């Protein structure tokens, strides 16, 4: 009988190419018995363009690498101080629709932020999580053989300026981050709370 457990891996600061290669390999080779995993990681500065995006979404690259990704969505920016949450879930086994998985993922972020008295919300037709009409968390998924990969990016304490160089996720929302709302919070405390919320929802 299947037990709803989940493994959380803390990968530290890694090149996005290396992590995406490992994530693709994990998804392609996983079996029905393979435990679901969540990977927490930070990436070096990089723009990633999803399957719905084009290079026209880059206004100025400013020597930041641009990488095409097989995730859903358009363009976004990753850098240290942003917590990437890769969600490697077998939807069939958990009896989840894609829509339900996305709601669960967004609720993890909302619940985590609520723990620090930050009120956040979702918007119809605009995936992600928002605070005061600014985006604090981006979301882009891919499903292969009933299993999810890619995930979310929560802005915590990073340089937001490069978001001005792009049309993020194909919309005009400004970006925000936790440190701008609650300056005394640190990356580690937020990550620990997020891990707790992940286990609450997926275990």
Curated annotation (Swiss-Prot):
Main location: cytoplasm
Subcellular location: Cytoplasm
Alphabetical list of PROSITE patterns matching this protein: BPL_LPL_CATALYTIC, LIPB
Gene Ontology biological process: protein modification process
Binding site for substrate: 71-78, 138-140, 151-153
Key words of the record: Acyltransferase, Cytoplasm, Transferase
Pathway: Protein modification; protein lipoylation via endogenous pathway; protein N(6)-(lipoyl)lysine from octanoyl-[acyl-carrier-protein]: step 1/2
Enzyme class, first EC level, given as a word: transferase
CDD domains: LipB (cd16444)
Disulfide bonds: none
Site-annotated residues for Lowers pKa of active site Cys: 135
Keyword Transferase: yes
Molecular function terms from GO: lipoyl(octanoyl) transferase activity
Biological role stated in the UniProt entry: Catalyzes the transfer of endogenously produced octanoic acid from octanoyl-acyl-carrier-protein onto the lipoyl domains of lipoate-dependent enzymes. Lipoyl-ACP can also act as a substrate although octanoyl-ACP is likely to be the physiological substrate.
Additional information: In the reaction, the free carboxyl group of octanoic acid is attached via an amide linkage to the epsilon-amino group of a specific lysine residue of lipoyl domains of lipoate-dependent enzymes.
Family, similarity comment: Belongs to the LipB family.
Protein name, per record: Octanoyltransferase
Organism classification: Bacteria, Pseudomonadati, Pseudomonadota, Gammaproteobacteria, Enterobacterales
Gene that encodes it: lipB
